[in-house]
Amino acid sequence: MIALLLAQAAVAATPAWKLADRTNPAGVRSISASVTGNDGLSRFVVKCDVGTEPIVSIQFIQPQSLGQGADKPVAVRFDGGPAFTYSWQFPGTGTYIIDPEAITRLTTFLVKSKTLRVETTNGAGFAVQANFAAPASDAMVRQVLGVCGYTLGVVPPPPPPPPAPKDTQ
């Protein structure tokens, strides 16, 4: 009986992934799958924003500022394995990456894992890290990626170049 109660408590303590799908008054759709970290404060987000063009991002959000500044390395580890390190953008309290190859690799590993860990530094150079539960299935991540035209596990082709200006002479 005690083992059953402990098992139920462990399941209840695992943060659940949540899907949010919104459209703002300007018609920009934003859909995301996110989870709160084991610390109860950090968040890991897979997001698609569809405005003039679709943009997929992976975001790591902290309650304390990570510092605004130049891009810097962020490492993501799945199930305690080797780090996948990419250069992420740092606008302030969070950090994000929009590189399609990185998004593809990170989401592919994310949906096959049980846990993930994000490691970086804040604006003062101090280590910042957070642990998260991976999603129980790939459904939410597939849904988010699909809205932006991505297929899980497939790097999308680059967008076509803009049309050349017409000669007015």
Language-model features: where?
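Hydrophobic h-region of N-terminal signal peptides that target proteins for export
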Residues: 2-13
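A generic "folded-domain core" signal
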Residues: 11-169
